[in-house]
Amino acid sequence: VTDENCAKTVTIIGAGIGGLYLIAELGVAGFKLRLHDIDDSKLSEIRGRGGVDVEGEKGGFAPVERATTDLEPATDGADVIIVVTGGNAQAVVARSLAPLLRDGQVILLIQGNTGGSLIVRRALDDAGCRAEVDIAEMDNYPYSCWRLSPTRIRPIVRKRWLQIATFPGNRIGEVFPRLSPLFPEAVAAPNCLYTGFTNANAMLHVANCVANAGRIESGDSYKFYAEGVTPGVARLYEAINAERVAVAAALGASVPTLADWFERVYGVRGATLVETCQRLTYNSDGPYQETGTPKSLDHKFITEDVPTGLIPMSALGAATRVGTPAIDALIEIVRSMTGNDFAAEGRTLGRLGLSGIDGLEIRHVVEEGLT
């Protein structure tokens, strides 16, 4: 690590597969890493090994200098704190971080889902955080890999295109140079509407689960993308995708269609979305080879992607008077199927700090910050 502007010491919060992705890439690259999780069983073998073994052409050993359930030693002196916990836990993590943060630190959400940076900013403020910290978010996980054991992974593919945004957007010029050496494929986005509306998980996961609910609940272990995305499911993808792009455009954000996103990120574009999903599964380097089928509808593909993805997209559509009938239908069907009212607990305009304002004012908030 030679760039004087970039982060040197990085704390990763969340020791799931997303956290291991980051340890593998950043540790081999020479960044000083700390790892935190509330579950010590996820940390003990990494702590005993002193890091993670990474297979492959650019593999090696990724050392972790601290692996702890205690946030204070995990974050003390860190330049960047990367939160890889899933969208539903981001506010909880922010409240725990609030008294420990120091001026100049950057919190990076991987991923921000839709509105993550706003949620974290409000949580820090509500918890009385006085430190001057920056908040950034990425639109997706940067890598795909196989976990061979608790301390050994094999990378599959690096995403070719990622976006990083800050909240407020006017901080990107200061923050991006510190983060770009960690993620060379990333580009700076003008604000968090760009990253939030490039939330592919919300597009891909919920519709597939709803359309294949019978298979999921009967225990059919189908290939989630190659077999789950039929022509009808692909048309549903297209419908919710068109609404996502339209709401983003009404807020001044230009975001890629689903087909364009697949091509930018993975270099794959089939004649149809069905073909694209099959190639992403069956190609030798296909990132979806190991995508598991949910065992029930009580799965993060629903419990995370509805409240932190579809709910805020629908709410922002209402604020800009852009209809989202397909997204709204999915939300209602999920409520009926699961009995969970995700609209009541999700990222509403009120929770985002955007209630009572129109699209132009929302654009001002994401550029300049909450007042």
Task: List each model region and its residues.
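Internal alpha-helical scaffold of NAD(P)-dependent oxidoreductase catalytic cores
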Residues: 149, 153-223, 227-262
